[in-house]
């Protein structure tokens, strides 16, 4: 019985990155032997055990055989006869197929160390193409290690392109697809994840709403990058540089989906694209089982980002309506999220990457002033029922008007 540290822990150690989780592989043992040693079995599809003291996972060495469609269509075979190399052969990338024994020696039958040094993401074997989830995993690794200079090996990209043309991707469950998206949104370069998927053809299959943005032009005056898909990737990158909130990053990703619905004869203009995108966002979120928190913010950003950009031109009454619609009174953190997404939208354009966004300070000041209206004092003054709401609303409009009057660059005009 031999125990090896495998997978991400070995890879990250070689990259001098923090090690989060440790996974172990056991060669030459039976489930009965593991149980006798005090390990607790938790794996249903294949033998995985928890260490009696550390609770870390120990999996028996196994092989896999493709028996059906999708990432779950595998038959696993675990036996004391399965060798270290046979187990490593079933793994996705060479950089994830390195093992370390208890003496600290590295076992690298598929040259993963050389690929780490060459910064290459390369598949271990042709069996890579049997698991469609690996297309998403490689895209995620490309995004995760983009800052370290990693690139996908040409032969691996060719395999991913072939896989994207088969029915395998459509066999992925929405939950597994979203799981990979969510992990990527939490990484340093989520835009790379989607760029890789587009490069291999998977974006069109899994995220047709996003893929449809590429090739849609925008006015060059405001968008020197012109292409809406390119702009979307730039906005996602900007949002990632400003916040780690995945909900904000998701909102940045989908804020312009409505532009794909603009009639070609109207290009490069996209009137009402924010509102046109709302049903598209709802449909995407429903299909992928996107959390409500992400969906609600994405809908708000799509619906209101044009108003936020034009904040200085809005009447005080319109600003209060925006605050009401977004329910900032009960969820003030949403204003910060909306503004972050709008800043990313403004800076996600060629030549505008470091542009100031005074609308943010202005709307924050408007909200702070409006939120200071004392509702309890209005109730104490004897107002009742619908009167309370009317008076509160009127007072809030007055407070915003005062901010507007003294704010440089804000138009004082209050008539429609």
Swiss-Prot record:
Chain positions recorded as CTP binding sites: 8, 11, 91, 137, 140
Cofactor: how and how many bound: Magnesium is required for nucleotidyltransferase activity. Nickel for phosphatase activity.
Binding site for Mg(2+): 21, 23
EC code: 2.7.7.72, 3.1.3.-, 3.1.4.-
GO terms under biological process: RNA repair; tRNA 3'-terminal CCA addition
Keywords: ATP-binding, Hydrolase, Magnesium, Metal-binding, Multifunctional enzyme, Nickel, Nucleotide-binding, Nucleotidyltransferase, RNA repair, RNA-binding, Transferase, tRNA processing
UniProt: ATP binding residues: 8, 11, 91, 137, 140
Cofactors named for this entry: Mg(2+); Ni(2+)
Domain HD: residue ranges: 228-329
Pfam families referenced in this protein's UniProt entry, alphabetically: HD, PolyA_pol, PolyA_pol_RNAbd
Gene Ontology molecular function, alphabetical: ATP binding; CCA tRNA nucleotidyltransferase activity; cyclic-nucleotide phosphodiesterase activity; magnesium ion binding; phosphatase activity; tRNA binding
HAMAP family assigned: CCA_bact_type1, CCA_bact_type2
Function, as annotated: Catalyzes the addition and repair of the essential 3'-terminal CCA sequence in tRNAs without using a nucleic acid template. Adds these three nucleotides in the order of C, C, and A to the tRNA nucleotide-73, using CTP and ATP as substrates and producing inorganic pyrophosphate. tRNA 3'-terminal CCA addition is required both for tRNA processing and repair. Also involved in tRNA surveillance by mediating tandem CCA addition to generate a CCACCA at the 3' terminus of unstable tRNAs. While stable tRNAs receive only 3'-terminal CCA, unstable tRNAs are marked with CCACCA and rapidly degraded.
Family: Belongs to the tRNA nucleotidyltransferase/poly(A) polymerase family. Bacterial CCA-adding enzyme type 1 subfamily.
NCBIfam families: PRK10885.1
UniProt subunit comment: Monomer. Can also form homodimers and oligomers.
Other notes: A single active site specifically recognizes both ATP and CTP and is responsible for their addition.
Name of protein: Multifunctional CCA protein
Organism classification: Bacteria, Pseudomonadati, Pseudomonadota, Gammaproteobacteria, Alteromonadales
